[in-house]
Structure formats: structure tokens, C-alpha cells
From Swiss-Prot:
Pfam families: Beta-prop_NOL10_N (PF23098), NOL10_2nd (PF23097), NUC153 (PF08159). It is found in: Nucleus, Nucleolus. Residues 422-476, 511-590, 647-679 form a coiled coil. Residues 670-689 have a biased composition (Basic residues). This is Nucleolar protein 10. Gene3D superfamilies: YVTN repeat-like/Quinoprotein amine dehydrogenase. Belongs to the WD repeat NOL10/ENP2 family. GO terms for cellular component: 90S preribosome; nucleolus; small-subunit processome. WD repeats lie at residues 50-90, 174-213, 228-266, 270-308, 310-349. It comes from Xenopus laevis.
Length: 689
């Protein structure tokens, strides 16, 4: 149980204790309660008073016996019996609950407005009926005399559903584009609806006509408020026959008297968050208003703050238990908070023991400040020989150890270890020696990957250190060796810098020239500082012309170096190409053989379409085709059987080609005229050899 004191008002948070995991068995839970003091001393007012993830709404039945809460995930409703201080039942729903209301004295009649436009009516056994409204709903109110449900939402109409007749009635047409909240006065049953334009429209359910219009947007603007947009109405609540509170989306609460169109009090939460809930405490004339961050309680007559509660999680809904000082909140957290404020009223009848508990805490306040105490563990108690004091007033159990008086601790420590001061002195001397050793020159161990780069960075770091000693105002540059973001660069071999790559060789001349230029500049600065010369316009001690000429010479130098590297790269590429050509020439090409898979049939290289067409024919037709082609010969044997001879197509074509050539040669011989009978004349003159 956590106790806070805000504005001299004590607030007891009954839900701040440790919670046990649901997956633990009962035996382990009991064992944990025996071991852990905080778990054993916690106050679990209602068993399992929580939701799996988030709780959105919470209400108390009119008879005060049942507490109902809606939450997610999965969307569900839980009912707690205060007489049994435990969960009575739980029902899972199809979609998230926007708002629900208890129509009966107990939990037997409940209405749920869901996020998918469905409205569910539940009875004791479960869901009784389910229907849908035309537009997405945001709030609803129940008119008891006529049994009408008024639904408001993303529409200008107020939908009326009569539960006695079981049908929709004529809607109320408003001037607003959308309506956020609504409420019905319990005394004279005036219906009020808060719009997104910052207005409140009041209707008479008897005549179904509008009887009033309040412009709350202009009234909520104060002198010290920055207006960023038109504030809309986010909360609405009646108090008695004449008073009404309106909450805006900018964090103001306006208290109205129905006889006037101007607010009596404008209370600003100073957070700029929409007001989510407004409650009235009639006994002390207090208004309890809540946004997602804070719950404020203030006087409705003068606006003076009474107290405030700031939960750890965002608040979704607030419910005040009737005629008591107990407060329930639905939060953006699994636990639903339970607050008990004795100044608001007594504890409810079902937890009257809280009054006695708070009285005991006030009579015997525990000192929570332990400046005069020393925290010791069980092991230290054994070393000091004080284990027999466990359970006595000299030791106060706290967490995993005990608190004991600091004077007693020093006395026992001196008796047990009289040479403690000498040990302390030796330890201090050892620390001083270690500090002096750390100031000596240390050999830095180079990493396994990128050793050259690491060595270069070490050298640059040393130069910057030397310069920073002389110029204290110079900002120290970050080093990637000590940066965790670049740690992998010196550990993973995949990040090794390839100094033979083309990119590195082309970039290296430029980098080396820049580093040389930087070193030269550092030397010049050191020289100027040593001589004591301070020149603001020419910090390097050179005229502008000389500096520009030096810069141009440097640029020419590294340009020549880059050209040289490019020429070397082209020459190396040419040599590699020639080497590949020589290897290709020496390599003897061999035919490639392809193996047919097991179970596959070899098919010739003819057109597959022709073969398929041939296979569709009958055996007789195929034999005739083969006979025409000359590849198939059928002959009868002497014993009455048949003999089939197949000739390969290639050999048959070769034979035909040879026969055609032979026939052509014979025809040429017949047509040729012989010249053997002709004799040539003897040549005159000297023969030519």
C-alpha cells in the first residue's frame, strides 16, 4: 500500500503492491508469499482486479454490490462481487466496448455500445439481443420514464431506441456535425448533448424539442490560454436539478447554472488534454475531474483545489463509489487502481477494515528515512556475529537485508576487525599507485582487422591530443576506435580494407595528400604558438597569394598521382587479359557428353510434332509409311513366319546418294567426245625447260 500526502490530504493507493503471475501454481504462490515480505504485506482488496492489457470503462451498480469493468485484449467485461471480494463472472465480446451502462439495480440488465456500431443487451445469463445503429456511436444515455436509449456519435442525429416497444423512434435532429457525449438529468430528465463545435444542446424528451443552447467554446477561453483550435465538448455531467459541468478537449471544466448561459467557474487542468470524466461529491461540494494524466478534486463554489492524484498510467475512466471515500480508475495498464481517501468519506461497508488500518498507520507512523541506519545483508550479519539479533527491535527487515543503527554497526565493526583502518589505508595507497601507472605511456594493442587504419587513427589521435594541450578551447574530435558503431569494422574480417582494389588505389593519393596537408598545418600552428605570434587575418603566417599557390601545387601533385595510378591499373588489366588469352589457347576443347536420366527414352532430333502425328496413326499406316521411305522390308520365310528388316535413315540416304553419283558419271561418259585420235604439231625452236 502506497501512501501519499497531497495538500495535507492522505491518499492510499491500494493497488501498488506486487502482483503475482497468473501462470504460477497455487503452491508456488503460497511459497512466494512466505519468502517475499512485500508480497505478504500487500493489500489485494479485490481478487484479480485487473485486465489482460488495458481497462477502458468502470462502473458500480446502484446497489453497490457489483463493480463492472470493460477492457481488452481480447475485448471482455468483468463483474466483481464486493461481498465476496472476488471475480463473479467474465464475458468475452466480439469488439471493443466504447461505453456501457447498468440499467438495473444489479448486473441483470446491461447495455454495451461497441466500436463496430453494434449495441448488445445483456441479462444475467449472457447476451440477450444484438442490434446495430446507423452511425458509429460515442456515447449513450438511458431515459428511465420512457425506456428510451439515446445514442450519439458521428452524426448530427440523436438515435432513439425504445426498449419497451423494441424499435427505433424518430431521431432528434441537431445543428452539430458530430456529437461526442450526452447525459440526462436524473431530476427533471433534461437531455443534453455535447458537440464537436463546442456547444451543448438541451432537449425536452416529452416534446422532443430543443429548449436551450450553450456555447461553451467561447466561454472556455481564458486570458492566459493559447487558442490553437476550436475546443469541443469531451465530458458532460449533471449535478442536481440546476447544475451542470462541461469538460472540453483543451483541458477546461466549465460549471454552469442552468438559469444562466455563462459559466460560474472555469477550471483549467493546465495540461491541454481532453477531460475524460467528471464526478460530483455532494458531501463536500467537490468536483472530481480527470484527464489522461491527473485526477483533480476542487471545490465547486470557489474552484480551490482539494487534492489531486497522478497515476503512473494514463487514465481512461474514473468511478466514485457512492457515499464513501473510495475511487476506482480504468487505466492504460493491466491493473485497475483503487484509491482510498479518508477525507472524502469512510470506507465502504464491504471493506470497513480499511478504516482501522489507516488509523493504525496514523498512530504508529514508520520513519521511512534511514539516515541514521546502516543496511546489512544476512551474510554481513554472519560475519559480524549478529545473526541472533534477527527478529529483535535492533534489526528492521527491509528488502533482502536489514537496517541497523549506524552507531551499533561501527562498534561491532571495530570489535570484529580492529585493523580495518590499516586495510583502508593500504587500499587507498594501492589506488594511488594504480592511478600513476595509468598515466604512463601504454602500448596500444592493434586490432586483428584493419591494423594499418587503426595505427593511422592512433597517430592522428596523438597529434590532436598534443594540439589540444596547447589550445584548450579547441573541441576534441570523436574517434571511431572508441565508438561502438564502428566496432565491427575492426573485428569482422568482412570489413577488411582491400589496398589492392581499384577504388582504394585511386582514392589513396587524395587521402594521403589531405593528411600531409593537415600535418603540415599542425606544424605551422605549433610553430606560431611557440613564437607567440597571433595573427587573426593570416593564422598560418603566409600571405593569401602564397597560400593559394601552395594549394594549387598540392592539387597538381595529387592529380599527377591519380593519373599514374590509373595508368598502372590499365597496364595491369591488359596483362591479366593477355594471360587469360594464353590460358584459353592452351586449353584443349573436349566434347561434352550428356547422360539421359534413368527411365527416360531417347528421342531423335526430328520435329516432335511430326513424331506425335505419326504416333496417332494405326500400326498398318505406320508400316506403309516406313515401306515408302524404304526403311522397312517385310519378307516371308519358309516356315511361314515373317521377317522385318529395318534400315537406318542415314545409311539409306548415303546409299541413294552414291547411286545417283554413279549414274551421273555414266551419263557423262556417254555424252563425252573423245579427243584421243588428234595429234599435236611439233613445236619449233629451242625447247623450254
Amino acid at each position: 500500500m502506497q501512501v501519499s500526502n497531497v495538500n495535507d490530504v492522505k491518499i492510499y493507493n491500494l493497488s501498488c503492491g506486487k502482483s503475482l503471475p497468473e501462470w504460477l501454481s497455487d503452491r508456488k504462490k503460497r511459497a512466494l508469499q512466505k519468502k517475499d515480505v512485500d508480497v505478504r504485506r500487500r493489500i489485494e482488496l479485490i481478487q484479480d482486479f485487473e485486465m489482460p492489457t488495458v481497462s477502458t470503462n468502470i462502473k458500480v451498480s446502484r446497489d453497490g454490490q457489483y463493480i463492472m469493468a470493460a477492457g481488452t485484449y481480447k475485448p471482455r467485461i468483468r463483474c466483481y462481487d464486493t461481498y465476496q471480494l472476488s471475480l463473479k463472472f467474465e464475458r468475452c465480446l466480439d469488439s471493443e466496448v466504447i461505453k456501457f451502462d447498468i440499467l438495473s439495480e444489479d448486473y441483470s440488465k446491461i447495455v454495451f455500445l461497441q466500436s463496430d456500431r453494434y449495441v448488445e443487451l445483456h441479462s444475467q445469463h449472457g447476451r440477450y439481443y444484438r442490434l446495430r445503429i446507423p452511425k458509429f456511436g460515442r456515447d449513450f444515455a438511458y431515459h428511465y420514464p420512457s425506456c428510451d436509449l439515446y445514442f450519439v456519435g458521428a452524426s448530427s442525429e440523436v438515435y432513439r431506441l425504445n426498449l419497451e416497444q423494441g424499435r427505433y423512434l424518430n431521431s432528434l435532429q441537431t445543428e452539430a456535425s458530430q456529437i461526442n457525449v450526452c447525459d440526462i438529468n436524473p431530476t427533471h430528465h433534461l437531455f443534453a448533448a455535447g458537440t464537436t463545435e463546442g456547444r451543448v444542446e438541451c432537449w425536452d424528451p416529452r416534446t422532443r424539442s430543443r429548449v436551450g443552447l450553450l456555447d461553451c467554446a467561447l466561454s472556455s477561453v481564458t486570458a492566459d490560454m493559447e487558442v490553437e483550435g476550436l475546443p469541443s465538448v469531451s465530458a458532460l455531467k449533471f449535478n442536481g436539478p440546476l447544475h451542470m459541468a462541461v469538460g472540453t478537449s483543451t483541458g477546461q471544466v466549465l460549471l454552469y447554472d442552468l438559469r444562466s448561459n455563462r459559466p460560474v467557474i472555469v477550471k483549467d487542468h493546465q495540461y491541454g488534454l481532453p477531460i475524460k470524466s467528471i464526478q460530483f461529491h455532494s458531501a463536500l461540494d467537490l468536483v472530481i475531474s480527470a484527464d489522461s494524466r491527473i485526477i483533480k478534486m476542487w471545490n465547486k463554489d470557489n474552484g480551490k483545489i482539494f487534492t489531486s492524484i497522478e497515476p503512473e498510467a494514463d487514465v481512461n475512466d474514473v468511478c466514485l463509489y457512492p457515499n464513501s471515500g473510495m475511487l476506482f480508475t480504468a487505466n492504460e495498464a493491466p491493473k485497475m487502481n483503487v484509491y482510498y481517501i479518508p477525507a472524502l468519506g469512510p470506507a465502504p461497508r464491504w471493506c470497513s477494515f480499511l478504516d482501522n488500518l489507516t488509523e493504525e498507520l496514523e498512530e504508529n507512523p514508520e520513519n521511512t528515512v534511514y539516515d541514521d541506519y546502516k543496511f546489512v545483508t544476512r551474510k554481513e550479519l554472519d560475519e559480524l556475529g549478529l545473526s541472533h539479533l534477527i527478529g529483535s527491535p535492533m534489526l528492521r527487515a527491509y528488502m533482502h537485508g536489514f537496517f541497523m543503527d549506524i552507531r551499533l554497526y561501527h562498534k561491532v565493526k571495530a570489535m570484529v576487525n580492529p585493523f580495518a583502518y590499516e586495510e583502508y589505508k593500504k587500499e587507498k595507497i594501492r589506488q594511488k599507485i594504480e592511478e600513476t601507472r595509468a598515466q604512463r605511456v601504454q602500448i596500444k594493442k592493434l586490432p586483428k582487422v584493419n591494423k594499418e587504419l587503426a595505427l593511422k587513427l592512433y597517430e592522428d589521435e596523438e597529434e590532436e591530443k598534443q594540439l589540444s594541450k596547447k589550445k584548450k578551447k579547441q573541441k576534441k574530435m570523436p574517434n571511431i576506435l572508441t565508438d561502438d558503431r564502428f566496432k565491427v569494422m575492426f573485428e569482422n574480417p568482412d570489413f577488411q580494407v582491400d589496398q589492392e582494389s581499384e577504388e582504394y588505389r585511386l582514392l589513396n593519393p587524395l587521402v594521403s595528400k589531405i593528411s600531409e596537408k593537415r600535418k603540415k598545418k599542425l606544424k605551422i600552428l605549433e610553430k606560431l604558438e611557440a613564437e607567440g605570434e597571433e595573427e587573426e587575418e593570416e593564422p598560418e603566417g603566409k600571405p593569401s597569394d602564397a597560400e593559394s599557390s601552395e594549394t594549387s601545387d598540392d592539387e597538381k601533385g595529387w592529380v599527377e598521382e591519380v593519373r599514374k595510378q590509373r595508368k598502372l591499373l590499365r597496364q595491369e588489366e591488359k596483362e591479366r587479359r593477355q594471360e587469360r588469352v594464353r590460358e584459353d589457347q592452351q586449353t584443349a576443347l573436349k566434347p561434352q557428353f550428356y547422360e539421359i536420366k534413368a527411365g527416360e527414352e531417347f528421342r531423335s532430333f526430328q520435329d516432335a510434332a511430326k513424331k506425335q502425328k505419326l504416333m496417332r496413326k494405326t500400326l498398318e499406316d505406320r508400316i506403309k509409311v516406313e515401306e515408302k521411305l524404304g526403311t522397312l522390308n517385310v519378307a516371308d520365310t519358309a516356315v511361314g513366319s515373317k521377317q522385318l528388316t529395318f534400315t537406318l535413315k542415314k545409311s539409306e540416304q548415303h546409299r541413294k546418294r552414291q547411286e545417283a553419283e554413279k549414274q551421273h558419271q555414266e551419263e557423262r561418259k556417254k555424252l563425252r567426245r573423245s579427243a584421243g585420235h588428234l595429234k599435236s604439231k611439233q613445236a619449233k625452236g629451242r625447247p623450254f625447260y
